[in-house]
Design a protein with these regions (language model features):
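Short, solvent-exposed turn/loop segments enriched in Gly/Ser/Thr/Pro and often Arg
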Residues: 11-13, 43-50, 89-96, 154-164, ...
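Active-site mouth loops of central-metabolism enzymes
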Residues: 12-26, 119-134, 274-284
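Active-site-adjacent "subsite" loops/lids of carbohydrate-active enzymes
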Residues: 87-147, 186, 199, 386
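N-terminal structural segment of carbohydrate-active enzymes
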Residues: 1-51, 81-83
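Aromatic-lined substrate-binding rim segments of carbohydrate-active enzymes
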Residues: 48-94, 404
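Carbohydrate-binding surfaces of carbohydrate-active enzymes
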Residues: 2-4, 33, 64-74, 85-87, ...
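Short acidic/polar active-site loop segments enriched in Thr and Asp
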Residues: 6, 39-41, 148-151, 300-301, ...
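Aromatic- and acidic-residue-enriched segments that line the glycan-binding/catalytic groove
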Residues: 54-66, 91-120, 155-180
Length: 444
């Protein structure tokens, strides 16, 4: 099944303090919402950040006030309408589990994992502990229970972060790493990330081979292809412009994602601000703009919503979404099978920091943000590149002014590009540095 253009990401993070979960759900109401919104794909919840499941379970805990098998009911409507479905599991968070198993919390360098009594909010769990077994069991149970009824698995809160819990400290020592070193802690964080993604892939391949898997890290696409390709299938770029990401984030992320050879979508929200804002409605023109921007950047669309705890869909929300998605639907004959073309390649400092440590002084992204704005505002056809990109596809490459090109594979690749007739746009970093000038002089 090709990736649809009009998706909903239906959050359902619901506290145990709320009663009557799903009590007002009706298939007719859900069907009316999907039709009003011109929706042809949706992400539905198996388990939320609070840790509760929304269907019968033997390996986790169902929400204590769940009135029905809500996931089954929602899937039945989507099957009737032919709407594609993904199923969501909050992997990095499970608050009810964290309360019962604080030994599995992610901990900072001082061993602190959070205070349940005085600090409101979710507490991050560590995949380097036995919690990974719990997540794997939840995934396997859900896959088995609903096999053949859905089209993808969405796992949330998957960012790679260092941890100093006892299991991680012991693991670092066993590999000859120093827990006192932040650099070594990050190396071990990658070990744990790979262990998690490998475990998930093994479970999915055993139960539903080939099922698309999304490992969501808040739209953080600039971590290298090896991390990006842990996603099996397409990419989903979470990027709510009014929810902390800003209007710079998505066009920049999309300009890189479209070079990776996979379909991808841009995930905004219906909220005036950010996730979970039940009373907030984005102006229809803003949502129309964000959907059009996604299409213009080569992406499909996803709009975030949060279902009321009683399970009744707000038709005003879906009329709002429908104002944008009706226009996307009308564009689809021209979008389907098309590809964005570019003749300028922008070498992102963020993408090159792995081989050029000086590329991002103090972690400042402003050079990348500014260059991307110039490309957008000048209406240039461009992509954002990483070291593995095919430079020969572009007539012009623009180098970050913060980044010196070290001797080695990247410099050789740029030399070959120039020898083949390509052009480089460079700035002060290269012109003022005699060593940088020297390797460029042969192409002047």
């Amino acid at each position: 099944m090709s990736l649809p253009y009009r998706q909903i990401h239906l959050d359902f993070h619901t506290s145990e303090c709320i009663e009557g979960i799903g009590s007002r759900f009706s298939r007719e109401n859900f069907k009316a919402a999907l039709q009003a919104g011109h929706v042809n794909s949706i992400t539905l919840f198996s388990k939320c950040h609070h840790g509760w499941s929304y269907h019968p379970t033997k390996v986790n805990l169902p929400h204590p006030h769940l009135c029905c098998d809500l996931l089954d009911e929602q899937l039945a409507v989507c099957e009737e309408l032919g709407v594609r479905t993904e199923i969501y599991i909050s992997a990095g968070l499970s608050e009810q589990y964290a309360v019962r198993h604080p030994e599995h919390l992610r901990r900072d360098k001082n061993g602190y994992g959070g205070n349940f009594d005085t600090e409101a909010g979710y507490h991050r769990l560590c995949f380097g502990t036995a919690y990974l077994d719990q997540v794997a069991a939840e995934i396997e149970e859900m896959l088995t229970r609903y096999k053949g009824r859905f089209d993808g698995l969405f796992l949330d809160i998957i960012g790679m972060v260092p941890c100093w819990c006892p299991d991680c400290v012991q693991g670092m020592k066993e590999r000859g790493l120093d827990p006192e070193s932040d650099a070594d802690a990050w190396k071990y964080a990658r070990v744990i990330y790979d262990r998690y993604t490998d475990r998930v892939a093994e479970v999915v391949e055993r139960v539903i081979p080939g099922l698309p898997i999304i490992h969501n890290d808040g739209g953080a696409i600039f971590q290298g292809r090896d991390i990006a390709f842990c996603n099996q299938g397409h990419f989903e770029l979470e990027s709510l412009p009014t929810g902390g990401w800003g209007y710079d984030h998505f066009p920049r992320a999309a300009a890189y994602a479209r070079t990776l050879g996979r379909d991808f979508l841009g995930m905004t929200g219906k909220f005036h601000t950010t996730w979970g804002e039940f009373g907030g409605f984005k102006h229809p023109n803003a949502l129309r703009y964000e959907a059009a921007l996604a299409n213009a950047c080569g992406a499909r669309c996803s709009v975030g919503d949060q279902l009321h705890p009683d399970g009744e869909f707000d038709l005003a929300t879906y009329n709002l979404i429908g104002a944008a998605y009706a226009e996307v639907e009308a564009r689809e004959p021209w979008l389907t099978g098309s590809a964005l073309t570019a003749d300028i390649g922008l070498l992102s400092a963020e993408n090159f920091r792995r081989i050029c440590p000086n590329a991002l002084p103090d972690g400042n992204l402003n050079p990348d943000l500014g260059a991307n704005r110039i490309m957008l505002e000048g209406h240039y056809l461009y992509d954002i590149l990483d070291p593995e990109a095919d430079f020969g596809k572009y007539r012009l490459l623009i180098l970050p002014d913060t980044m010196e090109i070290p001797e080695g594979e990247l410099r050789d690749k740029l030399n070959a590009y120039l020898a083949g007739g390509g052009k480089l746009l460079i700035g002060a970093c290269h012109l003022r540095n005699s060593k940088q000038c020297r390797w460029l002089c042969g192409h002047v």
